[in-house]
Amino acid sequence: MTRYVIGPDVAIRLAHDEAVIRGEHRLLAPALLRSQMLSLLYQAVRRGEMTRKDAERQLNYVRGLRIRLLGDRVLQNVAWKAAALLGWPDTFDAEYVALTQLHADALVTLDRHLAEAVKDLVTVAPIEALY
């Protein structure tokens, strides 16, 4: 069993593609994933990039995935340290890094800048690893 942390970018891509995750994989994310996804999809609808119906379909797809959502004190403390170490202005991305450090085998992100920034802290895997 391989445990992957996914962010909202990956969750939205999986929903868009209606991807089937291989059964031996486990998905994890910080609890903030839900709010970030909701916000990103809302913004896309406001910009006219998709319909509300499409956004709701993607939300429902992700809600149907078996993603373990975590957000405890230990995660927050490790996220704080990671954000400080990397000089980031906030801790949002650091929560994904911290969760990977604490509970996962790799972080899956579509963000090349994030992948480059964290490559010395966690293993980064391509989205194709999930299929």
Regions found by a protein language model. Give the residues of each.
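Residue-level signal for well-ordered alpha-helical positions
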Residues: 17-18, 40, 120-121
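A general alpha-helix detector
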Residues: 36-41, 58-61, 78-82
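Short, well-structured N-terminal submotif of metal-dependent ribonuclease cores
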Residues: 1-34, 44, 48-57, 130-131
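Short hydrophobic interaction/assembly module
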Residues: 49-72
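Acidic, PIN/NYN-like endoribonuclease modules and their adjacent C-terminal/linker elements
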Residues: 34, 99-131
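Active-site neighborhoods of divalent-metal-dependent phosphate/nucleic-acid chemistry enzymes
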Residues: 67-113
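Phosphate- and divalent-cation-binding pockets in alpha/beta enzyme and binding domains
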Residues: 13-14, 36, 78, 116-117
